[in-house]
Curated annotation (Swiss-Prot):
Species this chain originates from: Chromobacterium violaceum (strain ATCC 12472 / DSM 30191 / JCM 1249 / CCUG 213 / NBRC 12614 / NCIMB 9131 / NCTC 9757 / MK)
UniProt key word Ribonucleoprotein: yes
NCBIfam families: L29 (TIGR00012)
Gene Ontology MF annotations: structural constituent of ribosome
Record's protein name: Large ribosomal subunit protein uL29
Gene assigned in the entry: rpmC
GO BP term, pick one: translation
Amino acid sequence: MKASELKAKTVDELKAELLSLLKAQFALRMQHATQQLAKTSELKKVRRDIARVRTVLKEKAV
């Protein structure tokens, strides 16, 4: 997900996106812990998407 796409969204949409990403991260961590996760790079992608969403939320708050 690109930062420009995130900046076009409203605060409520960003919060919903953040919640879904956090749920996805939890599911991926559980799969990784039980050795069911084939693509471990997905964890990195989700973690960085979460950081992007949080950054845009902070920018909009200022």
